[in-house]
Amino acid sequence: MRMSEYFRILQGLPDGSFTREQAEAVAAQYRNVFIEDDQGTHFRLVVRNNSGLVWRTWNFEDGAGYWMNHVIRNFGILK
C-alpha cells in the first residue's frame, strides 16, 4: 500500500459558522454525519450513532465548527 493510499486528507469545518458547501464536503466523508432541519440558508449538521443523536449544531452558531469537528473526530464513521 502506498503512503498516499494509507492517509486520507479529510476536510474539516472552520471554528466558527460554516457554509452549506463546507457542511456537504464534511458530511460526504462520513456515514453518520447529516444535514437536517434545512431552512435554506440555515440548517443543522448532525452526528448520530446506533443509540441516536450524538451532537447537532446550527451552521450559524458561535463555535459551531469547532465543536462539530471535535465530535466528528470522536464519533464520526468514515465512508
Swiss-Prot record:
Classification via InterPro entries: DUF905, YkfF-like_sf
Pfam (any one): DUF905
Domain of life: Bacteria
Cross-referenced SUPFAM superfamilies: YcfA/nrd intein domain (SSF54786)
Keywords: Plasmid
Membrane spanning residue stretches: none
Entry similarity comment: Belongs to the UPF0401 family.
Protein name (database record): UPF0401 protein YubL
Organism, scientific name: Escherichia coli (strain UTI89 / UPEC)
Gene designation per UniProt: yubL
